[in-house]
Amino acid sequence: MKKNTLLNAELSYIIASLGHTDEITICDAGLPIPDRSQRIDLALIQGIPTFIDTVKATLAEMQIEGVIVAQEFKTVSPQLHDELMTLVQIEEELRGKPITISYIPHEEFKSHSHQSKAIVRTGECTPYANVIFQSGVVF
């Protein structure tokens, strides 16, 4: 369910069309995206847009109740992982309900991302900078 205004029409449409428990993936520039998945390619050049900016824009619009990240993200790219977790914590406080955080191996993450309604590719080039958001409800 949408919460605010987003300029990218494809991403805005996907968020507006999400039902409870539907998922979208926000990924770095290198995550493989299968042809059968809807790709929203925001990447312009290396680093633009960033993973965190894309997450912020998405969280401004999307009600989430679950987060899935690769286990490797926490150990290989701890600074970016911590930034993401801070944003999730803020979202949890705003929501007033807990947000489930799950860690799975990267290979499993790649397979799981194929179930997403859309995969949003950023210009991020930090290893394992990927997240799956599970849609919640605003009530």
Curated annotation (Swiss-Prot):
The active site is at H20 (proton donor). The keyword RNA-binding does not apply. One of its GO terms (biological process) is D-ribose catabolic process. One of its GO terms (cellular component) is cytosol. It is an enzyme of class 5 (isomerase). Substrate binds at D28, H106, Y128, A129, N130. Homodecamer. This is D-ribose pyranase. It comes from Aliivibrio salmonicida (strain LFI1238). The lineage of its organism: Bacteria, Pseudomonadati, Pseudomonadota, Gammaproteobacteria, Vibrionales. The gene is rbsD.
